[in-house]
Amino acid sequence: MLIKTLVINDTNDISKLKELKDKRVKIILLNEKIFIETLRVNKKCNIEEKIEQLIKDRFFNYTPLVHYEVLKYNKSLFLIVYFIGCDERFKSLLYERKDFSLSFPELKNKNIFSFKKATFELKNLKISIYIKGKLVLLKSVKDSNIIEVIEESIKSIEKDFRVSVKDFTFKIQKEYLKEEIKEWFKGLKLNEIRGEENLYQKI
């Protein structure tokens, strides 16, 4: 499968996209700084052109790091593009080093055996949806109607990946499990999980 990480300079000059190869630099970024686009593609698709078009269309005035993977699911190919915000602490790394790569929790595969279909996580002020261990959707639930965000998130994945809500394994942080939330998940595969201690007070 295709897996690449690219860096774009401040002017977003597409001609200066550069593949990152060096494994020595580890960067951890905040969840809110990741933007995900998922596109259905075919084997003849020019991936680089798709990436360039996405950057031009959605992030013209934004300086991101870009990580993308091709995922095969239900006999279809999907291009998953992660636009990763780069704050001031890391910008100097982009200019000081010719090549480096990224390592951070949101893009790492978890235990692949727990991702037979789709996994939905609600914890630490965000919703994350994984397909076969790949993060394909990330949304903040801060200052939001949680049930509305849950429904909206699942509908988009059902449509894109042709997966039913009954195929999901739901992992919900215990602080979110109020009565109305429990009622919504009634009859579905629901697991209670723990979040980060310092975020409990914000929920």
Regions found by a protein language model. Give the residues of each.
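Hydrophobic/aromatic-enriched cytosolic interaction surfaces used to assemble or bind macromolecules
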Residues: 1-203
